[in-house]
Curated annotation (Swiss-Prot):
Species name: Streptococcus suis (strain 05ZYH33)
Family (UniProt): Belongs to the UPF0398 family.
Protein name from the UniProt record: UPF0398 protein SSU05_0416
Pfam families linked to this entry: YpsA
């Protein structure tokens, strides 16, 4: 993957029905994220760009923080869609939001929501300012992420690695076989 800056996004925790940090699926998801991130780092990725979403992005942030603590050289950015992103979240999620704000680079695309076109422009900005993406998404299980996903598919020369449910099933099999 000839990529230096990687957009990282995917399903939210609610899309996957994961509402507890103790959910056994998290270990498998984070294991797959870790394996892929190490490969990306070995291939020269230096910046990981997040948008501040709970679920896949937050778990990715946790893995990136662990990798950094282990000595991997990497930079993390969060580019929120709006300045008030997450302000209505509960206390536990506010703590997660705070972690997104403690990375190497933090910006907001817009001061506040005004119209739906902002999301299209925001997605385009993310694609224009990264050289690839790591996406946990399956077109068979659509969410609002489909808009970004279709933009990624249309962007020529844009590197894409998609984490699929099939890959997670393989990760689960490997995990259970190693115990």
């Amino acid at each position: 993957m000839d990529t230096k800056s990687l957009l990282v996004t995917g399903y939210r925790h609610t899309d996957l029905g994961i509402f507890s940090e103790k959910d056994p699926r998290l270990h498998i998801i984070k294991s797959a994220i870790r394996r892929n991130f190490i490969r990306f780092l070995e291939e020269g990725v230096s910046w990981f760009i997040l948008t501040g979403q709970l679920g896949f992005e937050y778990w990715s942030l946790e893995v990136l923080e662990d990798l950094r603590a282990e000595g991997y050289q990497l930079s993390i950015a969060t580019i929120f869609p709006f300045e008030n992103h997450g302000e209505q979240w509960n206390e536990a999620n506010q703590a997660k939001l705070a972690r997104f704000k403690q990375v190497d680079f933090v910006k907001y695309a817009y001061p506040r929501y005004e119209n739906p076109g902002q999301f299209r422009d925001y997605n385009q900005f993310l694609l224009d300012n990264t050289t690839g993406c790591y996406l946990f998404y399956d077109s068979e299980n659509e969410t609002n992420l489909k808009y970004l996903y279709h933009m990624v598919l249309k962007k020529e020369g844009y590197n894409r690695k998609t984490l699929t449910f099939e890959e997670l099933n393989e990760e689960a099999e490997n995990f259970s076989n190693s115990e």
